[in-house]
Curated annotation (Swiss-Prot):
Record-given protein name: CASP-like protein 1E1
Highest taxon, organism lineage: Eukaryota
Membrane-spanning residues: 52-72, 104-124, 131-151, 186-206
GO cellular component: plasma membrane
NCBIfam families: A_tha_TIGR01569
Protein family (similarity comment): Belongs to the Casparian strip membrane proteins (CASP) family.
Organism: Oryza sativa subsp. indica (Rice)
UniProt topological domain (Cytoplasmic) ranges: 1-51, 125-130, 207-215
Subunit architecture: Homodimer and heterodimers.
Lineage, top ranks: Eukaryota, Viridiplantae, Streptophyta, Embryophyta, Tracheophyta
Length: 215
């Protein structure tokens, strides 16, 4: 009967016809009826994109520079405080600004140090096929850490630069000028590193998408 005939290319009848290998999860196309054995796990290293490596090196160096600059940021100066009596000379009081005095700056240093450590580990595992997905997930977490740390540090820096008239918080960057400049420089470098990590994550996703046999 007509219904009992096998369909060429699906059950092996019809020699020379194009066929698919359904023995593996991906079903590799052979084009000649012969099954193509799937690659063994870890049998071949994934291709390395030089652009991705360059971006990761930039993130590594950028987060290191941001963490070091912020952690070394310290300034001691002297401010004048007017005495109660008009004829009395103003009092000269020594004051010090350090990054540890701000929880936003502490979080900034810790986040950059964590991203630096992850970037170094990711560079060491760049040739391992089994590390592609864990590194991609780590890049997502690192990007979130960087953007949140940059936002917190930038908000505190703007508060020191401009103050807040609504709650009568005076600006302090006119007193601690070099301290604020170094802190904002570290924030800018970390922001650029965060965008570089974003581009790196997008390129990694595109590379995996192109290399996948599903599409």
């Amino acid at each position: 009967m007509e219904s009992s005939r096998g369909k060429p290319g699906l059950n092996g009848s019809g020699g020379g016809a194009a066929a698919f290998d359904y023995s593996s999860r991906r079903g590799y196309y052979t084009g000649a009826g012969a099954a193509l054995p799937p690659l063994a796990a870890g049998s071949r290293a994934p291709p390395v994109d030089p652009c991705c490596v360059a971006l990761r090196v930039f993130v590594l160096l950028g987060t290191l520079a941001s963490a070091v600059v912020m952690a070394a940021d310290r300034q001691s100066t002297t401010v004048q405080i007017a005495a109660g009596e008009q004829l009395a000379p103003p009092l000269r009081v020594p004051v010090t600004a350090k990054w540890t005095y701000s929880s936003a700056f502490v979080y900034f240093v810790v986040a950059n140090a964590m991203v630096f450590a992850f970037s170094a580990a990711a560079l060491a595992a760049v040739r391992r096929r089994s590390a592609v997905v864990p590194v991609m997930v780590g890049d997502l977490v690192a990007m979130a850490l960087l953007f949140s740390a940059v936002g917190a540090a930038a908000q505190f820096g703007l508060l020191g630069e401009r103050g807040n008239a609504h709650v009568r918080w005076a600006k302090v960057c006119d007193v601690y000028g070099p301290f604020c400049e170094r802190a904002m420089a570290a924030v800018v470098v970390a922001l650029i590193a965060a965008f570089a990590d974003l581009v790196l994550l997008m390129l990694t996703i595109l590379t995996i998408h192109k290399a996948s046999s599903y599409y």
